[in-house]
């Protein structure tokens, strides 16, 4: 599954990029964190009005008040929202509970986790009822030439839920992520900043 991340500050630019991506066949559209911080949940409402059949992801990166944030995202029209794992399991559990109550999928962002801890946490998230987990390669790691392939390969045998991968993916690296076991490939700038996003 291709997920197009709209990491813009202006809703008008995000909608323009979403239109092009939709024309190109992308059906999973993400209101990125910068867009949500700039425009709020109006970004989700606007995307839902324009793309009623899209699978909309609100990249809320929730850290606290999980039930409240997921309820708000669901009521705005999101199909899925994201939660970042912290030292407290309660936030993820509240998001999962809200997901059941409001019909919104939960993606747990595993940013920063590695090795055995990554596997342990991903398995726990699956047991709690998360829809999928996301391996997010930070920009700083990308600048050092790192990629998420090894993490995907290490994690895939241990969970049955989808694994999403994000961070610097393009037409050359996305197939490698899929080959490694990623189910959802999240691409932002390589699509939204291209001359022909529909292609």
What feature does the model see in each segment?
Residues 1-6, 29-31, 56-60, 81-83, ...:
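Hydrophobic faces of well-ordered beta-strands that scaffold small-molecule active sites
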Residues 1-67, 124-128, 199:
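Conserved N-terminal beta1-alpha1 strand-loop-helix module at the mouth
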Residues 8-13, 33-38, 62-65, 87-90, ...:
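Short, small-residue-enriched loops and turns at beta-alpha junctions
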Residues 22, 74, 126, 178-179:
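Non-catalytic positions within long, well-ordered alpha-helices that form the structural scaffold/packing
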Residues 37-61, 94-111, 144-171, 199:
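Alpha-helix-loop-beta-strand connector modules within alpha/beta enzyme cores
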Residues 65-153, 157-158:
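Conserved anion-binding
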Residues 77-78, 180-182:
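As written
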Residues 95, 178-179, 190-199:
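C-terminal helical cap(s) of enzyme catalytic domains, especially alpha/beta-barrels
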């Amino acid at each position: 599954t291709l997920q197009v991340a709209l990491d813009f500050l202006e809703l008008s630019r995000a909608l323009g990029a979403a239109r092009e991506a939709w024309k190109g066949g992308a059906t999973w559209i993400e209101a990125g964190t910068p867009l949500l911080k700039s425009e709020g949940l109006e970004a989700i409402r606007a995307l839902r009005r324009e793309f009623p059949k899209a699978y909309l992801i609100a990249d809320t990166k929730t850290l606290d008040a999980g039930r409240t944030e997921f309820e708000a995202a669901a009521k705005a029209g999101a199909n899925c929202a994201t939660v970042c794992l912290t030292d407290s399991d309660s936030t993820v559990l509240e998001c999962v509970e809200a997901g059941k109550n409001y019909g919104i999928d939960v993606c747990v962002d595993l940013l920063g986790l590695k090795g055995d801890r990554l596997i342990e946490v991903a398995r726990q998230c699956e047991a709690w009822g998360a829809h999928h987990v996301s391996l997010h390669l930070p920009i700083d790691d990308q600048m050092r030439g790192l990629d998420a392939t090894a993490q995907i390969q290490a994690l895939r045998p241990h969970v049955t839920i989808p694994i999403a991968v994000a961070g610097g993916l393009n037409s050359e690296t996305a197939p490698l992520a899929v080959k490694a076991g990623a189910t959802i490939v999240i691409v932002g700038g390589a699509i939204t900043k291209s001359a022909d996003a529909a292609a």
